[in-house]
Amino acid sequence: MAELIIVYFSSKSNNTHRFVQKLGLPAQRIPVDNRPLEVSTHYLLIVPTYAAGGSDAKGAVPKQVIRFLNNPNNRKHCKGVISSGNTNFGDTFALAGPIISQKLQVPLLHQFELLGTATDVKKVQAIFARLKHHTHDKQNKPTT
């Protein structure tokens, strides 16, 4: 099977980290500090949203994630994005996902609130399995 992992960012609050732990999938965390991370395999990106709500989308994508995605090698391996947020912030709920999806031209696969629910965990596990299978099929497709 093709290798596929979760790459995620979680602040010191660890909300996203706790969600990723529930998935039980191979994962790498984008460091909170300025240490670089480079991945050399396909991945799904899980990212929280840092927007204030209303029409203020500034800062929705964490700076660490921007820094990570500024590396062309990291960008090319991203197969999709999943974002979290807080519905109390209205229109900016989980906005980091659509922003990254548009910039990288990858699918926005799911959005969840705060720590996510058991249903969110199952959905993301299913998305991961489907994408891993699809990635495997593409890599093993005979050339004509």
UniProtKB/Swiss-Prot annotation:
One GO term (biological process)? protein modification process
- SUPFAM superfamilies under this entry? Flavoproteins
Single GO molecular function: FMN binding
Show the InterPro entries listed in the entry: Flavoprotein-like_sf, RNR_Ib_NrdI_bac, RNR_NrdI
Which Pfam families is this protein grouped with? Flavodoxin_NdrI
Report the protein's function. Answer: Probably involved in ribonucleotide reductase function.
Question: What HAMAP family does the record point to?
Answer: NrdI (MF_00128)
Which NCBIfam families does UniProt cross-reference here? nrdI
Q: Which family does it belong to?
A: Belongs to the NrdI family.
Question: Which protein, by its recorded name, is this?
Answer: Protein NrdI
Q: Which organism is it from?
A: Streptococcus pyogenes serotype M4 (strain MGAS10750)
